UniProtKB/Swiss-Prot annotation:
The protein's name: Protein EURL
Function: Plays a role in cortical progenitor cell proliferation and differentiation. May promote dendritic spine development of post-migratory cortical projection neurons by modulating the beta-catenin signaling pathway.
Alphabetical list of InterPro entries matching this protein: EURL_prot
Organism name: Gallus gallus (Chicken)
Gene for this chain: EURL
Coiled coil found in the keyword field: yes
Length: 293
């Protein structure tokens, strides 16, 4: 019967480098001198890469620390460009949704923390008016009163335009009940007449029918030619002021209607494209991004 042959295994690994796992002479192995210097500088032992019990080559420990200190963050490796594009697209669509819902973007704390990307530098401008589109009809009104004779301004009208007193010839002047016209060269109302005008406006709002000053045929016949001319110019000036005021109101109404139409179109397009973007979810508060970080 053959004798059993046993293989002797040396469990003494004092001559094996803990980094490269190669056997060498025991005299050439030592502990990590870099961790030893860091411990002397105040770094706790729990943050060190090697303990005092590990033995290895000096070059192996230096290469180990060199590889460990390389600038290779995990976030840069695990984050894909597609995820970054989805994040930017989600934030941009959320901004469009907030703009369409007429929300205040400047008060949003989340938007103030975002990066200075060109997509996020846009802000809602309340004073901006939308330009007419290519298929929009041309307005049938003018912003200025068109004079039929296209002649020079008369002396009386020029004196009226050069007055420094505040002008109150608006819609309220046509509603004033006891308005009278003076025959002097200055036809603008003074401060006391302005207060009467405001009082007449408040009274006219409560009355069922608004009234404006009128003259009978006898009163007009008793006036001189100069008085009639001044009265005519004053009435023309009132008509021009009312016309420009109504024109401004119509323009503001058209601008608001155009802006509302653009918002409705934006919301409709976003709802149609919602199914094509799996990174977005529809909720009661609007579109919410669902991008994994």
């Amino acid at each position: 019967m053959n004798e059993e042959q046993f293989v002797n295994i040396d469990l003494d690994d004092d001559n094996v480098c803990s980094v490269c796992k190669l056997g060498t002479e025991k005299e050439t192995l030592s502990f990590c001198h870099i961790c030893f210097e860091l411990n002397i500088e105040g770094v706790p032992k729990s943050d060190l890469l090697h303990t005092r019990s590990l033995r290895g080559h000096r070059d192996c420990f230096e290469k180990f620390h060199l590889i460990a200190n390389q600038d290779c963050p995990r976030t840069k490796l695990s984050r894909s460009p597609y995820a970054e594009v989805k994040s930017i697209l989600s934030k941009k669509i959320n901004w469009i949704i907030q703009y369409a819902q007429n929300k205040d973007i400047d008060s949003d704390t989340e938007s103030s923390k975002t990066s200075q990307h060109p997509l996020f530098n846009l802000r809602h401008q309340t004073d901006r008016k939308l330009l007419p589109q290519f298929d929009s009809p041309v307005p049938r009104y003018s912003a200025k009163w068109i004079d039929g004779n296209s002649g020079s301004i008369s002396n009386c009208s020029q004196s009226l335009l050069e007055q420094s007193e505040p002008t109150d010839f608006r819609l309220g002047m046509l509603q004033e009940t006891g308005a009278t016209f003076c025959c002097s060269s200055v036809l603008w109302s003074n401060r006391s007449q302005a207060q009467k005008t405001e009082k007449a406006e408040s009274d006219s709002l409560t009355s069922p029918h608004r009234r404006h000053p009128h003259y009978s045929r006898e009163e007009l016949n008793m006036m001189t030619t100069g008085e009639l001319k001044q009265l005519n110019e004053k009435l023309l000036k009132q008509i021009q002021d009312v016309f420009e005021e109504l024109t401004q109101q119509v323009q503001e109404k058209d601008s608001l209607a155009s802006e509302l139409n653009v918002r409705h179109i934006a919301i409709e397009q976003l709802l149609k494209n919602c199914s094509k973007l799996p990174c977005l979810q529809m909720g009661r508060a609007g579109m919410k991004s669902n991008v994994p970080i």
